[in-house]
Amino acid sequence: MVQQADSLDMDSSQHTEPDTEEGEFMACSPVALDESDPDWCKTATGHIKRPMNAFMVWSKIERRKIMEQSPDMHNAEISKRLGKRWKMLNDSEKIPFIREAERLRLKHMADYPDYKYRPRKKPKVDPSASKPASLAQSPEKSPKSRSAGKKCPKLKPGSHSGSSSSSGSAKSLTIKSEYGGDDYVFGSPKAASKAAKCVFMDEDDEEEEEDEEEDELQIRIKQEEEDEPLRQYNVAKVPASPTLSSSSAESAEGASMYEDVRNGTRLYYNFKNITKQSTIPQATITLAPAPRSAGTTSPSSHKDELMFDLSLNFTQQNPPVPELGNPNSGNLSLSLVDKDLDSCSEGSLGSHFDFPDYCTPELSEMIAGDWLEANFSDLVFTY
């Protein structure tokens, strides 16, 4: 009887002793902990957990081993190592864990047939609960803050007092752009618990401001033009040779020119009014050299020969009498002087019309001679 009892104990121990892997599976599985407990996959709060997959089954075993070897290792570091090791496993090594995960899934379905995966949502923290009651309502949603939204005008050089008075007792906050932009004034948010809101100016307002600035600029330019003393150009009659100065026509022209100057006729350099005003007198600039007198050889006569008759005749309606055969009164008439350039250096008495002669005698002869050859074939160079 004792031998039979020993043999029965041996048989029962052989049948009940599972393999190492199966023992680990059973040890880590909730069924092995308490198969009779129907709430084996529920938490204390009544939440039903999902069944473990193959990786969870394998990681539960390996995690216990690592925690036994190095209890001070952080849980996140253990999870990283387990993930790397699971990827390195072969498919044949994963098969037993896949089978155990399938068994747990079927057990889970049998015990909880009405289970549906519903992930727990994290409760949203109400931001208004932590804030005081006065700031609970956001300024965008509150109708009072919309009506209390203040317009932020651009700062002008003379608008600092207006901006300070508009903000009331609250201090105004001036913000200047870092990139050279415009300045804006923001009211203090503490004033009467109204939220300051920046409303940018419309394009129409900006255009009106630009038009006002242009008008001010034009008024300023007109004032400067009026304040500036108008330049008066004194036109003096240049005396010509003795033969021409004794003529009556020349003296009459000189007298009329001086009368125009006395009457206050002025030349305006206003580019805007040149085309608009038709009453501006036309300027007649006549450069008429005095012909060389035949019998005069004194230095004063040479000086008179170099003088040019510069007359500015200003007429409002009737053109003046043509001077020295001038065909058109409003055109510039120029007549060349037929004289030797050597006489320029003679008799200089310090007048601003005397110019020194830098020409050599050879160059003077070339200028006095014929400039063009009779035959154009002489101008062709042959190489």
Swiss-Prot record:
Chain positions covered by the region annotation Disordered: 1-24, 115-174, 197-231
CDD domains linked: HMG-box_SoxC_SOX11
Polar residues bias spans: 1-11
Biased composition (Low complexity): 158-169
Keywords per UniProt: Activator, Developmental protein, Differentiation, DNA-binding, Neurogenesis, Nucleus, Transcription, Transcription regulation
GO BP annotation list: cell differentiation; head development; nervous system development
Biased composition (Acidic residues): 201-216
An annotated GO cellular component: nucleus
Function statement: Transcription factor that binds to the DNA sequence 5'-AACAAT-3'. Acts as a transcriptional activator. Plays a role together with nlk in neural induction during early embryogenesis.
This protein's name: Transcription factor Sox-11
Provenance organism: Xenopus tropicalis (Western clawed frog)
Organism lineage: Eukaryota, Metazoa, Chordata, Craniata, Vertebrata
